[in-house]
Amino acid sequence: MKRMAALLALLMTVLVGTLVTASPAHARSEPECESYVDVSNQAGYRVAAPIGKYGVLPCSLLWGDGGAGTVALQWALNDCYLAPAGKTLLNDDGAFGQLTFNALKFAQSKAGISADGQFGPQSRASLKFPAYTGGTYGTPTCARLGRPLP
């Protein structure tokens, strides 16, 4: 009986230790991209780029996030990846759920990076974002952030 109690105590210790030290599947290493900034260059191109609170970079977007930063990502996914491939477009609702996750994985694979469905520094540097000229929002030119536009 004492052996059974000792074994049960050991098992409970291991289980509790595992539950306490387990990390979430999508641990965030950067703050959430809560907003976006409309960046312009000298040629007159404007790009909506996700940013963290108070303009913090790098930032990340994960499943379950929502807001203006997710909207900017959805615009990029629609204009630079889904529309050119003839795929169904996302609603730009600011909700990072299954459809945004799948679209991001598609874009990441097209960009040649790890398709994990998480938007962080590598995705920000590798994915293309829509760049518009003038006062119209017609067909965009897609380019990577920090790179010269055509």
At which residue positions do the language-model features occur?
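Extracytoplasmic/secreted envelope proteins and their assembly/folding machinery
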Residues: 70-74, 101, 124
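Sec-exported extracytoplasmic/periplasmic mature domains
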Residues: 75-82, 105-113, 128-132
